[in-house]
């Protein structure tokens, strides 16, 4: 649980950043992603729900949500004193505009936070409505302010992440127990999801593949597992708002010697990455280190996707562990590191998990076996 004092500290830091940028207020909009929750403590949490927070440099903040039936939960979740329901998305804009006019901010510079590295959640029509209602406002993109704050996690955030990781491991264990001939991919995923939900999962995402060399991960299918299948499962789970992610490999029956070797080579690159993910290095350097380990094992042509990303209130978050991301790794960052390879004639291996960057290396907070 994130204490109220921490939300108040976030607001203080945001106001300092606003002053440095000559912003008169910050307007934050969101529905599914974590920007509103990071500031307010409230997550809209429903498919068509949304919320808007206005945080002035000096006056009290307000929050407007779309659905009236969620008002009680919003007020219980948030430190913001003035919370009301607007009824529809357009009214979110008109309520925010009225507040800015009332507080003599309709001629100021307003910072916009409407998404992250994955998606901008504010519909174009909603922004146009705001712009029409506030023709004298200067709008300034301010998403990077929040992104920078969210890179390094606090002690209470790390506690939530460790709790989330326990659920992810619970789901992986349930999946492993379910993997046997005749069981479908749907059934394996259902076992993982049920175990996590029973233990308090707020949200989850489970993908699976028993195709090995042909497909690394994908949505579950009605395909029944057969002896010799190479099963890859990736589990992400949210608890107390915070996501963790783990990727595991299972074999239906005894794995082949070649698949064991592929697992060992990928696991070696993964453990090396945990050692190399230390303060002062960049994400691009970490990506090169993982890539070099796999290439030295003769797997240059087998490498799949990037090597990981940040995680927290959102899945994924900044930064990305790839060659073009030069973000400097800092103590307190949380990274999902997941090298993946797919080799025709052998199978696929996807190993990874959530790790906390400490003074000298990253600490893995999942249980991942060192052999297949």
Task: Give residue ranges: language-model regions.
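Active-site neighborhoods and metal-handling regions in enzymes and metal-associated proteins
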Residues: 1-372
């Amino acid at each position: 649980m994130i204490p109220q004092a921490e939300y108040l500290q976030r607001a203080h830091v945001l106001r300092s950043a606003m002053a440095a940028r000559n912003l008169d207020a910050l307007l934050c909009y969101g529905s599914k992603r974590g920007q509103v929750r990071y500031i307010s403590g409230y997550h809209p949490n429903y498919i068509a729900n949304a919320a808007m927070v206005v945080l002035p440099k000096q006056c009290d903040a307000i929050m407007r949500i779309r659905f009236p039936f969620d008002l009680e939960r919003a007020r219980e979740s948030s430190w913001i004193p003035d919370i009301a329901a607007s009824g529809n998305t357009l009214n979110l804009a008109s309520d925010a505009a009225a507040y800015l006019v009332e507080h003599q901010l309709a001629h100021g510079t307003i910072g916009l936070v409407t998404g992250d590295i994955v998606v901008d959640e504010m519909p174009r029509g909603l922004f146009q409505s705001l712009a029409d209602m506030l023709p004298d406002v200067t709008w300034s993109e301010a998403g990077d302010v929040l992104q920078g704050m969210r890179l390094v996690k606090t002690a209470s955030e790390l506690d939530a992440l460790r709790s989330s990781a326990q659920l992810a491991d619970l789901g992986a264990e349930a999946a492993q127990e379910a993997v046997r001939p005749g069981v479908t991919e749907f059934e394996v995923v259902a076992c993982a999801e049920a175990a996590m939900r029973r233990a308090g999962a707020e949200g989850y995402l489970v993908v699976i593949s028993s195709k090995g060399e042909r497909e690394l991960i994908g949505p579950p299918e009605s395909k029944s597992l057969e002896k010799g299948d190479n099963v890859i499962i990736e589990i992400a789970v949210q608890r107390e708002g915070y996501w963790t992610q783990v990727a595991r490999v299972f074999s239906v029956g005894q794995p082949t010697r070649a698949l064991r070797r592929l697992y060992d080579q990928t696991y070696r690159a993964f453990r090396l990455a945990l050692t190399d993910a230390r303060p002062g290095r960049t994400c691009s350097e970490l990506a090169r280190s993982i890539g070099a380990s796999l290439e030295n094992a003769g797997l240059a042509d087998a490498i799949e996707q990037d090597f990981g990303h940040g995680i927290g209130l959102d899945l994924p978050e900044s930064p990305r562990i790839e060659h073009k991301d030069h973000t400097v790794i800092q103590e307190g960052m949380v990274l999902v590191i997941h090298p993946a390879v797919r080799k025709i004639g052998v199978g696929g291996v996807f190993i990874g998990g959530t790790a906390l960057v400490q003074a000298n290396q990253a600490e893995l907070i999942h249980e991942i076996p060192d052999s297949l």
